[in-house]
Each structure stands twice: as C-alpha cells, then as structure tokens.
Amino acid sequence: MFVDIYDQLYISYAAVVSTLGIIFNGFLLFLIFFKSPSCLTPYTVFLANTSITQLGYCICFLLTVPRVISINLRIVNIYLGFSQFLGHWWSYMIFTTMLHFAVNSFLSIMLSMVFRCISLKTLRFPTSGAFAMCILAYMIPLSMVVSIRGIEITSNFTINSKYTLWQLENLDKYRTVVGTTMAQLSTLWVACCVSILCIPIYSVMFWCRYRILRMLERPGYMFNTTTTLQIKRLVKALTVQSLIPVFTLFPASLIFLSTQFHVIETTKFGYIIISLLSLSPTIDPLVTIYYVQPYRKYIVDLLWSEERPMVSPFLSNNDPRFYRSRSNSVLMMRNTHFV
C-alpha cells in the first residue's frame, strides 16, 4: 500500500478526528438514552437522530479516509482507509454513505429549530411527530445512497489521470482509485445535496429563529420572564450548532464547487474538502452536552463528585408561575434544561 508523507498526515488526522467523534457521539447517546428527563422526550428524538448520524459519519470516514480530487466536472477519490481492501464499488458506496450522513446531520439541526418554532405555537408536540419529521427528512439523504446503485465508476489509471489533468504523481501506485463524472444524474444529485441543499436548509433555520424571537418579543405573550429567557437560551444553543457548518460544511462545499466549475483548477485541495467536513461530527456533540443542563450536570458530578447538585437559579417548583397551566408548565420544564 503506497502512501506519501501528506497521506500519512491525513490518515493521522482522520484517525484522531474520527476516534474523538465516535467517543463524543457515543457518550452523548448514552446521556440521551439514560440521563434525559422524560419531559425532554420530543427534543431528544432530534438529539439522538443527529448523534446517531454523526456517529455513522465518523465510522465511514475512518473506514474510507478519502482523498477527494474534484476538478472540471470530474471526481477522483483515492481511498486510504480500510475500504481500499474491499474494492472500488464498496469504497465508493461507503464514501457516499458518509456524505449522506453529513447531509442528514445538517437536516436534523434544522428540524430541531423547526420543532422549537412549532412547539411554541401549539404548546404541545407529540413524540410521534418528532419521529415523523426525522423519517420524512431522511428521505433526501437516503435518495443519495439509492441513486448510485447504477452509477458508472472507473478504476482505470489512464482515465483517472485524464480526469485529474495528469497533475497527480504516483496515482498508479495507490490500491483503490475511483473516478466518475458529473454528467451522471446520480453523481450530480449527490453533489447538489452536499452543496446547494445547504442554502434552503439554512434559510429555514434562520427563518424559524426569526419567528421564535418575534413571538417571544410580542407584548402580552403568555410565558413569564423566566421561561422566555430559557427559550432564548435554547435558541442560542441551536444557533451555535447551526453556525458550526459555516466553518466546516460551507467552505468544503465552496471549494468543491469552485474546482468543479473551473474557478480553481488544482488538485491541492484533495485533503481539505473532507477534512473540513469531518470537524462537525466532533464539535457538535460537545456543544450539545454543554448546552443541555442535565448532560452538563452529569459531567460535572462525574468529574467532581463532591460538588452539590446544580439547582437552577431561575425556576423553582415552588414558584406559583410554574403551574400557570399544564401545557405551559411542561414547556417550562423542557426549557429549564437548557442553559
């Protein structure tokens, strides 16, 4: 198996980032399933959906460690991970599965914001509704995997060298190199989902954020100051999560599109595209653990067992405002778990 010094650095990076992502998301799933208050059930569906998706992404990244050469409507992937021993088709399938996990993770963050917007209007949100939203949204990334069943790929050295404009040295020494073109609808659809789809997703997220803040600022709104403050903090947490792709997914998509449409004609970004994309699954679970109070409290108690249990300074069960209405009290309990 041939690897140069840059490949070795990239493999080391992939091993560290993927391993941390698997550990963080695995631990977050433990917290979701065993340390979540029952009143958070609808929201934990979205948390679990995001975490499971990101865990799957990290596993696929570790298996493939793809070096993506994107240039002039051609894509050539050099697989440096274990999947190279599984053959060309399986390597490309796992790679596409990895991309579909990335898209579903982004969609799941959007659904969390949509959930908050809807729940503020209705004051009730069934768990079945959360599952239905996740399943319906998953149809988009699932179509990415289904669409490549009949894709035409090549492992021919001469063709792949032409695809990369003969700019890659030692291409013939790699065990598994897969090339394809954007002329195929399946490849075009996958590329659009990873790049262009980000625009409507972000539009929905920030429209929901705008609507939530407008509702909370409306005079005479039914929630008291405490609940309003907690909801704003939850919105802040979701906003922070939605900003992570700005520094990971968006630059990766921009580089990919720039190389595809002749803005940049170089193979030097082969390591960067997936490297940027792979930061989100590692950072996002840490953001979730920090902002969800029961999870953060569990970490604090685990590390400093002598500390007293954290008590929210904003809301007490003895506060009569807590019992303003049954629907309102449930929503208040949900929001007090976000700080």
Swiss-Prot record:
UniProt topology in membrane: Multi-pass membrane protein
Alphabetical list of InterPro entries matching this protein: 7TM_GPCR_serpentine_rcpt_Srd, Nematode_rcpt-like_delta
Cellular compartment(s): Membrane
UniProt KW keywords: Membrane, Transmembrane, Transmembrane helix
SUPFAM superfamilies, per database record: Family A G protein-coupled receptor-like
Main location, first listed in the record: membrane
A GO CC term attached to the entry: membrane
Domain of life per record: Eukaryota
Transmembrane domains' residue ranges: 14-34, 45-65, 94-114, 128-148, 188-208, 237-257, 269-289
Family stated for the protein in its record: Belongs to the nematode receptor-like protein srd family.
Protein name: Serpentine receptor class delta-32
Species assigned in the record: Caenorhabditis elegans
Gene, per the UniProt record: srd-32
